[in-house]
Amino acid sequence: MSIKYSNKINKIRTFALSLVFIGLFIAYLGVFFRENIIIMTTFMMVGFLAVIASTVVYFWIGMLSTKTVQIICPSCDKPTKMLGRVDACMHCNQPLTMDRNLEGKEFDEKYNKKSYKS
């Protein structure tokens, strides 16, 4: 069974989307505590803060996405954005690298860490 690679930008966007749904779920839980206004307000505020946090994450990844390197994937011939030394295609999840020293090596996200020496 092969390893499923995923693009870093898509991972962060998925995290932000999950924050939206988690925030709405937490705020909805506050409805069940209508008789205790403090608990209800706390749940709704925590849910609201999770939705605001997702907005911040979406803004951050949008700004980061404008600074990334755009390349053409050799497998699907579609443009994709690459963060770091190794990443995966946004469309076909093909492992990609722009570092000549890593060509032909097994895909590993540890190559993106500053402490890793090739």
From Swiss-Prot:
Keyword Hydrolase annotated: no
Entry-linked InterPro entries: UPF0295
Source organism, top-level taxon: Bacteria
Localization terms from the record: Cell membrane
Topology term for the membrane: Multi-pass membrane protein
Coarse class of the protein's main subcellular location: membrane
CC terms in the record's Gene Ontology section: plasma membrane
Transmembrane segments: 12-32, 43-63
Keywords of the record: Cell membrane, Membrane, Transmembrane, Transmembrane helix
The family this protein is said to belong to: Belongs to the UPF0295 family.
Protein name: UPF0295 protein BCAH187_A0594
Taxonomic source organism: Bacillus cereus (strain AH187)
